[in-house]
């Protein structure tokens, strides 16, 4: 026979596990976005400090704009996570 206290314990434990998993997923999403932001930021730094060293990118401005678009994409993800799930 299952006691009410056992059901309560099970529900509390399940709820805690769900919260832990939720936080781990959100943290992973945030770190993923932050990593991509840093990657694209560093690319821009390279283009700004040594534009002639990047032979396959003849239009530096356009190339930097593409990197900025990627930063904006991942920053939007971070903003949404914080606003709706944080």
Question: Model regions: which residues?
Answer:
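Short, Lys/Arg-enriched N-terminal segments with co-localized hydrophobic residues
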Residues: 2-20
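Extended, charge-rich alpha-helical interface modules
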Residues: 22-86
């Amino acid at each position: 026979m299952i006691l009410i206290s056992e059901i309560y314990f099970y529900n509390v434990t399940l709820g805690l596990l769900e919260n832990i998993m939720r936080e781990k997923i959100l943290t992973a999403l945030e770190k993923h976005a932050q990593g991509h932001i840093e990657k694209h930021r560093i690319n821009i730094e390279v283009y700004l400090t040594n534009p002639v060293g990047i032979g396959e990118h003849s239009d530096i401005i356009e190339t930097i704009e593409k990197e900025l678009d990627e930063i904006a994409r991942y920053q939007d993800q971070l903003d949404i996570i914080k606003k709706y799930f944080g």
